[in-house]
Structure formats: C-alpha cells, structure tokens
Amino acid sequence: MARRNKAKKREISPDSRYGSVLLMRFINTIMKCGKKSTAEKIIYDALSLAEKKIGEGGLSIFETAVGNVTPSIEVRSRRIGGATYQVPVEVRQDRAVSLALRWIAKATSAARKKSGKTTVDCLQSEILDAYNKRGGAFKMCEEKYKMAEANKAFSHLRF
C-alpha cells in the first residue's frame, strides 16, 4: 500500500452539447483507444433516439437512468481469523456513479455482441431499460443489493 499523499482527482470538464459533467464521465467510460469524438457521437445519437421515443429531454432521461442503476450498498471482503466474510458497506457517491456508468456500458456491450445491432441502438435501449428499472445494468444493481441482504449478519464487522 502506498504511503505517499493521496492522488488528486482530476476535474472533468462538462460536455459540449448538454453541459453535463456526468455525461462527460460516461463519454470517457464508453471511449475506446482515445476516440472521444466517436464516443460522443454514439452517446448523442442514442440520447436523441431516446428523446424521440419518450418525449423528454435526453439529459433528464440519462440522469434518471443512472440514478435508477446507482447502488447505495455493496459487499467487501474482510478477512478475520482465517475466514473471509462478505461485509455489506455503504458506497461512496463517486464510486456509486462510476459503477452505474460502467454497468450501463457493460450491458450495452453484451447486448451488442448478443443481438448484432449497432452500438447506438443497444445503448439507447439500455438507457431506456435503466430509465424503466429493468435491463442488464439494473439487474447488476439488484445483484449487489441481494448480496448485501444475504450477508447482513456480518454488517457488525464493518471497516
């Protein structure tokens, strides 16, 4: 474990179209091989398709979807006396949002490989699924809650 100062968090600038830092974080999550303009195009196209389907603003749809997938509790491994316990702990807000963005990206990637549709279509459907509290990303969030509920007996072993 490092004993130096903690690394400073870099400030993320808001995206150009909506002026949202959350959306820029998602663009950085989706981006591959440094191709930010391609990632922006994919996300903006998916949000415009979602706008047409629902009739609300793209940013509000996205923020609600991320909010629905954001976990508030997770389990962490804790070794005590030769036994390893899964201890439920609260998730920091920054980590919770990062997990939600990663899960949406992961579910989109899995759907794209499975169905053969374009990334834009899969991302749009995954955002709408998260908005309506269903889909792959929401399922991952529910699994976190189930694990925490199953290991509630070990909550007194908190860090």
UniProtKB/Swiss-Prot annotation:
Keywords on record: Ribonucleoprotein, Ribosomal protein, RNA-binding, rRNA-binding, tRNA-binding
One of the record's GO molecular function terms: tRNA binding
Quaternary structure note: Part of the 30S ribosomal subunit. Contacts proteins S9 and S11.
Pfam families named among the record's database cross-references: Ribosomal_S7 (PF00177)
Name used for this protein in its record: Small ribosomal subunit protein uS7
CC per GO annotation: small ribosomal subunit
Family classification: Belongs to the universal ribosomal protein uS7 family.
Gene: rpsG
Source organism per UniProt: Wolbachia sp. subsp. Drosophila simulans (strain wRi)
Family annotation (CDD domains): uS7_Bacteria
Alphabetized InterPro entries for the sequence: Ribosomal_uS7, Ribosomal_uS7_bac/org-type, Ribosomal_uS7_CS, Ribosomal_uS7_dom, Ribosomal_uS7_dom_sf
Task of the protein: One of the primary rRNA binding proteins, it binds directly to 16S rRNA where it nucleates assembly of the head domain of the 30S subunit. Is located at the subunit interface close to the decoding center, probably blocks exit of the E-site tRNA.
Any one biological process term the GO annotation gives: translation
Domain of life: Bacteria
